[in-house]
Amino acid sequence: MGRHSCCYKQKLRKGLWSPEEDEKLLTHITNHGHGCWSSVPKLAGLQRCGKSCRLRWINYLRPDLKRGAFSPEEENLIVELHAVLGNRWSQIASRLPGRTDNEIKNLWNSSIKKKLKQRGIDPNTHKPISEVESFSDKDKPTTSNNKRSGNDHKSPSSSSATNQDFFLERPSDLSDYFGFQKLNFNSNLGLSVTTDSSLCSMIPPQFSPGNMVGSVLQTPVCVKPSISLPPDNNSSSPISGGDHVKLAAPNWEFQTNNNNTSNFFDNGGFSWSIPNSSTSSSQVKPNHNFEEIKWSEYLNTPFFIGSTVQSQTSQPIYIKSETDYLANVSNMTDPWSQNENLGTTETSDVFSKDLQRMAVSFGQSL
């Protein structure tokens, strides 16, 4: 509790009480009663606060205070009251006439608590210590089980994380699981096919050709867009020979080819074929010396899906894109240089329109 306001207004004494102060307080309360404790110091002529006078009277100067040690009956009563009220010492003291709360608290902490422990009784719960320890031992396994269950709940996520790490750390080469052909880019810019017969065992059975009901496309489709890029007006460009710009609308041709050996790739530097399990990798030559190939032929990259192939006699599917550059080659000196004023705006407008037409025609054709 905080001090009364009178303690801050004037200088009051603190500490031990002198015999003269005890006599003044005892005489005043005996003759007039204590009344309001805040007014007692002024009426008794003491330089003390009201709280100090009250505590001095209750704990030391009361005529009904019992002096001496506590009897065994009082100790047993204190134990019974503590089991019901706990550490409420003032309420316990009200049940023991002539005893103060301070005396009871000191007796509890000094002697009664030790006696209860020697008897095997917990001073806090007033139960046998064996029961309290067994109860605490039962709580420990439950907490450990909760921790284990929490770890068990976390284990699937960790295992899923390990599974994700297993797949994420693998190289993203789908050719090991599907019928994609691998390409070896040599120094002469030739492309050769390297197949591995051991990859057939890694393909799931649902993706095997025998289990497929039908082929996605029964006949091969060859999409051949022909695009003519406009030349620039710069005289130093090898593609720009004049002020004319010739554009060819995209021409999408759909044709079927019933012969594997008559396609476009037989006369150039591409040796592409559907992976055949009967042919081993030793029959395919990895390195070939090819003739000069046009730049537009390097863009012809067929994309095979092994799961859509029904048998060895099914026809290949490839997309053939050719880009024709129509320009006057008489003044070719520098490739792909653009005019700063007219070339960029004209070509960008033409290309955007041309690409829109290509997208529309390609969507309608497929």
From Swiss-Prot:
Annotated protein name in UniProt: Transcription factor MYB61
DNA-binding region: 37-61, 89-112
Gene null: resulting phenotype: Increased stomatal pore opening. Reduced amount of seed mucilage. Early germination, slow growth, delayed flowering and senescence.
Any one Gene Ontology molecular-function term assigned to this protein's record: transcription cis-regulatory region binding
Native source species: Arabidopsis thaliana (Mouse-ear cress)
Subcellular localization: Nucleus
A GO cellular component annotation in the UniProt record: nucleus
Main location: nucleus
Domain HTH myb-type, chain residue ranges per copy: 9-61, 62-116
One of the Pfam families matching this protein, by short name: Myb_DNA-binding
Tissue and organ distribution: Expressed specifically in guard cells. Expressed in sink tissues, such as xylem, roots and developing seeds.
One GO BP annotation of this record: regulation of stomatal movement
